[in-house]
């Protein structure tokens, strides 16, 4: 198994542990969700991802602890790319916290999601994740490293939600042909 995939899953578990008190508001999306749905199936997807993506549903998000405090307490730090919602675990593996665009307050002129009292830099507003907060199921997520015994129950976006998110992502990147490879 690819070492990068093992590290990315470990970072996902680090984030789920950090955000345990926000458990009901967190949904695994992106490649990690696809891997969880496909398991060991022989499918035509790249079986390596360098990051983990988490959708945050602010409708049931507790005010305490603040997302940024929970992440920092677990050793995460903001990615220097200055993109809101971009975090790195202590090993430098990225985890992105994203809020569905229509669930973020304020105008669309900001990349950082507006979900007071949480920091505007804690999460990023993202078009296309709305379906993930509706189409998801509770799944058991385990480490891929045989020496890591952690297991978490977390919401994972369903196939329809993942497809909708991918279509939006591709549409956003039509003006950036060099970024259409994922």
Specify the residue positions occupied by each region the protein language model found:
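Compositionally biased terminal segments of proteins
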Residues: 1-182
């Amino acid at each position: 198994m690819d070492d990068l995939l093992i590290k990315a899953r470990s970072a996902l578990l680090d984030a789920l542990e950090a955000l345990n008190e926000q458990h009901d508001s967190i949904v695994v999306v992106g490649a990690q969700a696809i891997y969880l749905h496909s398991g060991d199936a022989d499918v035509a997807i790249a079986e390596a991802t360098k990051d983990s993506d988490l959708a945050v549903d602010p409708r049931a998000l507790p005010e305490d602890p603040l997302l940024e405090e929970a992440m920092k307490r677990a050793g995460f730090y903001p990615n220097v790319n200055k993109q809101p919602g971009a975090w790195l675990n202590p090993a430098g593996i990225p985890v992105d916290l994203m809020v569905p665009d229509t669930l973020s307050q304020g105008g669309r002129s900001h990349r950082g999601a507006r979900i007071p009292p949480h920091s505007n830099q804690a999460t990023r507003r993202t078009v296309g994740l709305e379906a993930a907060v509706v189409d998801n199921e509770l799944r058991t997520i385990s480490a891929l490293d045989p020496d890591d015994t952690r297991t978490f129950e977390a919401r994972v976006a369903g196939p329809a939600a993942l497809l909708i998110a991918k279509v939006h992502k591709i549409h956003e990147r039509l003006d950036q042909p060099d970024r259409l490879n994922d």
